A protein has these predicted regions:
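A short acidic, amphipathic alpha-helical/loop segment
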Residues: 66, 138-145, 166-170
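Short catalytic helix/loop segments, enriched in acidic residues and glycine
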Residues: 19-37
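Short beta->alpha connector loops
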Residues: 59-61, 133-138, 157-161
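Extreme N-terminal starter segment of soluble prokaryotic enzymes
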Residues: 1-4
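Short gly/ser/thr-rich secondary-structure transition/capping motifs
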Residues: 109-114, 156-163
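Conserved N-terminal subdomain of the carbohydrate kinase-like
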Residues: 11-23, 40-130, 144-148
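Conserved phosphate/ATP/ADP-binding segment of small-molecule kinases
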Residues: 147-151, 158-211
């Protein structure tokens, strides 16, 4: 497998200055998967499954049309686990102004509460492993399975920095690339100077346990 993405498939309620939407297909795995499929498909023959695997848990309420949308994009869905009787992860959030920062109003972990991803054995050594925005404990469990990954990237958000920073710090010490916005960098480093903040994250000084 060229690329393995482990993230959330979710339904979101979103509020912005210009409007709102309920039960919108969302989740870090959804957006990362579709973006990767878009760029990968340009190098493939039309149709078929791309060398791009998605790993997540969903509930029985996950819409068949949404599942098919991801499959039609070319994503390999063998890593998707449907939890009997479960409800899909839900997030209610708000974006204001330049929409650079997500404000979490409510999170319903549902099937992701205690979830331990099962990455298919054939996917344990991908060229790229992308740990899309998710609870750091889930990201750590994936790293334990995919020890053969050639390059590992991670995304996170202010919610996990607030409530699971020690776990996030541990995961960040095991990756090649962290994708963070300005606000998240400042939150982790506790420094308004982005150059200093970025360096203190890179060298581990800002993470739990220090250098």
């Amino acid at each position: 497998m060229d690329i393995v993405i482990v993230g959330s498939l979710a339904y979101d309620d979103l509020e912005t200055d210009s409007g709102s939407v309920k039960n919108s297909l969302g989740g870090s795995g959804t957006f990362a998967g579709l973006a990767a499929a878009f760029h990968t498909s340009r190098r493939q023959d039309p149709g078929g499954t791309l060398p791009l695997g998605l790993v997540c848990a969903i509930g029985e309420d996950f819409d068949d049309a949404d599942f098919q949308l991801l499959k039609d994009a070319g994503l390999n869905m063998d890593g998707i686990e449907t939890v009997p009787g479960g409800q899909t992860f839900r997030w209610h959030g708000k974006y204001e102004g330049d929409m650079a920062q997500a404000i979490t109003i409510e999170t319903q972990q549902n099937v992701l509460d205690g979830y331990q991803p099962k990455v298919p054995a054939a996917w344990w050594a991908p060229r790229v492993l992308f740990l899309a925005n998710n609870h750091p404990s889930i990201q750590a469990h994936v790293l334990d399975q995919c020890e053969g990954a050639k390059y590992i990237a991670l995304d996170s958000m202010n919610l996990w920095i607030d409530i699971a920073f020690e776990e996030l710090s541990s995961v960040m010490r095991r990756i090649n690339l962290a994708i963070l916005n300005d606000n998240e960098v400042r939150m982790i480093a506790k420094d308004e100077n982005l150059i200093r903040a970025g360096e203190s994250i890179r060298n581990g000084e800002s993470l739990t346990g220090g250098k």
